[in-house]
């Protein structure tokens, strides 16, 4: 150790002190300049689109207002995709090495078809990154305080005032502003396929993942009602491919009592019943809903159904439903806070938006129930709180 220290202290017999200082300066400058030049070059739009996998999204960008507009200000790739702060920039550069790996080594995005198959995954990753830093790259140009709402469209001005008040992240509402939106259904439909593949009806308490017909007796051909998605049943008996189940729910006492709901006064549907299933129900209790002064009865129905499309834990269903919500309602605008509406209010709200989606009946039912079970007047019930509201 002493020899090493002495060697470091003594001037080199071969090089002068001046030469060593000069070499040190050159190395120091190189260590400063080369990374800077490297970052600058690899941040240019020309460099970004030099990979052929980026050509389709480049053409999409050229059709956007960020490429050509009345003011002549152009947002380049780095303006949107590289955070302005040094730590964020370095982190993003390191993450970008994965893009190179996926293109040239893994070959997962090296054709238009492969890229399209992963578009939703790539977009969600970028949205999450922008959400995490509160759209810092957007804010390097756009500033809530600098906006003249009088020059905006009235609806845009209204939305921007709300966003400014809450300091909302730009990406919440402005997805797809520079690139084509992905088909988000590919993500949540794959998730449903995985949920269906993991179906497990071994427990005493089960939850439906699909709309399932129910029957008055085992082996019946004609259904006596339907069990709706994300509904709980108790298993009374197992017989081959059939399950005898017990369904509990509320119905308005003065009505036809064909629809069971999760809570009295809230139209969160559990099941529809008719025929012999309806005739054999038991009334467990009654209560009056103060808001409407109507009497509701808690009923218990016994029925049969075929095995399949049932799980013994509600949480995977809610995780799938959350993907449904974010993948569907974020397409046109920022998805509102679920607790902004009450359970009954979500029916009309979702009906007003459902025409802009490609959801099928099962997906629509699952999404509605998820929203209702996390609404302002039921928040927490979707996570295991069984306390009923009177």
Curated annotation (Swiss-Prot):
Part of the anaerobic respiratory chain of trimethylamine-N-oxide reductase TorA. Acts by transferring electrons from the membranous menaquinones to TorA. This transfer probably involves an electron transfer pathway from menaquinones to the N-terminal domain of TorC, then from the N-terminus to the C-terminus, and finally to TorA. TorC apocytochrome negatively autoregulates the torCAD operon probably by inhibiting the TorS kinase activity. The N-terminal domain interacts with TorA. The immature C-terminal domain can bind to the N-terminal detector region of TorS. It comes from the Bacteria. GO terms for molecular function: electron transfer activity; heme binding; iron ion binding. Heme 2 binds at residues 77, 80-81. It is a single-pass type II membrane protein. GO terms for cellular component: Gram-negative-bacterium-type cell wall; membrane; outer membrane-bounded periplasmic space; plasma membrane; trimethylamine-N-oxide reductase (cytochrome c) complex. One of its GO terms (biological process) is negative regulation of signal transduction. Heme 3 binds at residues 138, 141-142. Heme 5 binds at residues 329, 332-333. The chain crosses the membrane at residues 17-37. Heme 4 binds at residues 170, 173-174. This is Cytochrome c-type protein TorC. It holds the Pfam family Cytochrom_NNT. Heme 1 binds at residues 48, 51-52. Residues 1-16 are cytoplasmic. NCBIfam families: PRK15032.1, torC. Residues 38-390 are periplasmic. The keyword Metal-binding applies. Binds 5 heme groups per subunit. The gene is torC. InterPro entries: Cytochrome_c-type_ET, Membr-bd_4haem_cyt_TorC, Multihaem_cyt_sf, NapC/NirT_cyt_c_N, NapC/NirT_cytc_sf. Keywords: Cell inner membrane, Cell membrane, Electron transport, Heme, Iron, Membrane, Metal-binding, Transmembrane, Transmembrane helix, Transport.
